[in-house]
C-alpha cells in the first residue's frame, strides 16, 4: 500500500505508512509485515455527553475474508459478528492504550483496525497494537504515547522477536510485550512452565525488541504528526470539591472501608456519599451541582483512602497484610452426573467449574484467516452472571470481558494438558462465577484445574493462579517514589489500585499471565517483585488444592464416554468410511458408538461409547471389515492382566513411559512403577526406543487404559530365578 509518508523497522520487517488513505480520520496508519496488512484509524468526538463521568474508548478489530482470498460462509456471504479472535485482539489493543489518555479527557475515542491482506505467515494482532499506537501518535488526539508491541517466543532455548506462525508451533513461550521507552505497559500470554527467572529475562528481551518500533513511530510523527488538540477536561468544580472534602475527610472514609466485609464497606461508603450530596444541596442549592461533581470527588477520596492504608499503615481495607491471601476453600465432586466438578473459593470470590469429555470430533473448528491452528480440542468458557455481585442485569451470551477472562484461564491450563495421543478426548471446562470480589479469572484456573483432575484428565501438573496489585505514591516530577505490591487483590483494590498482574502456574513455573495497568508504565523492579511474590502465593494455593484431591483420578466418570483406539491399515481408511461416509455412518447408527479417524492418515481409529456392549460391537464390525483391530489398537494379541511382556518404549513423558507390548498395543508404565526406588526423571531409567520388560498390573474397565509395571516384572522374574536356583537338581 503506497502512501505519502512511510518508515520501516528493518530489524523486524515492519513498515508504517500514512498520508493517502482515510485522510478524514484524525489518524490513519497502515502496518505491513511481509504481505500482511493491518489498516488502523483513530477518531475522536468533538464534544462529551451531558453528565458523562467515564471515558468511552472503543477498539474494534475486524478481519476481512477478502484478505485471505476467501468468501465468507453462511447465507448472506458477508462478515458478521466479531469472532473470538477479533474480540481478543481488540482487547489486546485497548488495554495498553487506555491508561495513556489524560485524566479528565472524556471525549469518545474510536480505534478501528482492519485486516486487509493476510499472508498466512505473519500474525496480525501485534500489527494492530502498533498501528493503533502510530495512528494515535500522529493524530491531534491527546495521548501520552507512543507505545510498541512485540511477540516473544522461545525456540530451542533462544528468544525470538515476532516469530512467524509456523515458528510458534515450536515455541515454549508466547509472550506479547507492550511498553514505552522506559517501562512495560501490558503483557499477556502463556508458557510451558517457564521458571520465574527465565520469564523476567524474556520481559527484558521484549523491552529491548520494541525500541526500534518506538523509534520508527516517532520518525513518522516527525514527518506528518498533527499538533495535539485542546479538549476541555471534565472534573468537579472547586466549590463542590471543597464541600465534599470537608464533610467526608479521608479519615472518615478510611474508617468506613477498613476491616469490614464487602457489603458492609459498600453500604458505609454509600451513606457517606449521601451525606456529601445532602451537604452540596444545602450549601450550593438544588441544581447547582451535578452528579459528575459528586462522583469525581468521591472516586478521588476512595483512591486516596485505599492507598493511604496500604502505603502508610501497611494494612489493607479488609485487615490483611501486604502478602496475605484470603481464606481458601477447595472441593471436588460437588455435582453428580457431570464428568468432573469442583468448587474453589478465595474470600468472597467463588466459582464452580464443570468438565465435560467428548470425542475428538467435538473440537471447535477455527476459521483462521491468518493461518495457524485450525481447531482446538480444549475449551474453557467463563460465565459471569449478575447475581455474582448481588445485582440484576442481562443474562445472555458472553461479553468481551467474559471472553477475555475465559481465554486467560484457557491458555493457563493448556500447557499441562496431556497430548491427544495419550488422552484422545475433546475437553470443555465451564467456569460459573457464583460470587465475585476480585480475581475471578484466577479462581477459574484453580477451579478448572481441580475439575479436570476430578474428571480423570491426566494433567502433567496442577495449576493455580493469583493476582498481584500495586499502590503507588508519586514524587513532584511524576516518578514513583513509594510503592507496595499486594497479593490477592479485592475488587476495590483492583478498581482504585494501579495494577492487576495475573500469574498462573505450577510448582515448576509460569503457564499463563496478564498485566493491566492504570499508570503510565511499570518499572522492571516492581514487576520482578510482583512475579516472585505471586510465586510464593501460588505455592500456598496449590497446597490447599492438592489437599482436596492430591492427583487426577485414576478412572473416568462412569458417565464419561469410554474410548478404544484401533489401528487399521491406512490403505483401508477409505473402506471404513465408505462411499459418501455410508459405511462408517452405518456402523455408528447400528452400534450406537461414535467413531473418529485420525486426520494424519496413520490408520488410528477412535471408538467412543459409554456402553461397553456398543463399543465392542463397533470394534468387531471394524475388525471384520478392515482386519487387525482389537482393544487398545492391537494388530497382535491383546494385553492381558498378570502377564509379563518385553516391549519397545514408544513414548517418554514426565509422568512415565509408553511401552508397545504387542504389535500396535501399548500401555503406560507410570514413573512410580519404573523401579523400586524413587525416580526423579523418566529419562533416568528409560529412553525412547529402549527394550524393557514390564508386567500388566491392570486394565481400566471404562477407559481401556493399560497399566504396566517394570518394578513388578523385575520382582517376579527375580523370584522365579531364585526359585529355580533353589530347586534340587534332577
From Swiss-Prot:
A single cellular component GO annotation: cytosol
Top-rank taxon: Bacteria
Cofactors: Mg(2+)
One record GO biological process: mRNA catabolic process
GO molecular-function terms, A-Z: 3'-5'-RNA exonuclease activity; magnesium ion binding; polyribonucleotide nucleotidyltransferase activity; RNA binding
Ranges for domain KH: 561-622
EC category: transferase
Presence of the UniProt keyword Signal in the record: no
SUPFAM superfamilies: Eukaryotic type KH-domain (KH-domain type I), Nucleic acid-binding proteins, Polynucleotide phosphorylase/guanosine pentaphosphate synthase (PNPase/GPSI), domain 3, Ribonuclease PH domain 2-like, Ribosomal protein S5 domain 2-like
This protein's UniProt keywords: Cytoplasm, Magnesium, Metal-binding, Nucleotidyltransferase, RNA-binding, Transferase
Keyword Transferase part of the UniProt annotation: yes
InterPro entries: ExoRNase_PH_dom1 (IPR001247), ExoRNase_PH_dom2 (IPR015847), ExoRNase_PH_dom2_sf (IPR036345), KH_dom (IPR004087), KH_dom_type_1 (IPR004088), KH_dom_type_1_sf (IPR036612), NA-bd_OB-fold (IPR012340), PNPase (IPR012162)
EC number: 2.7.7.8
Purpose of the protein: Involved in mRNA degradation. Catalyzes the phosphorolysis of single-stranded polyribonucleotides processively in the 3'- to 5'-direction.
Protein's name in the database: Polyribonucleotide nucleotidyltransferase
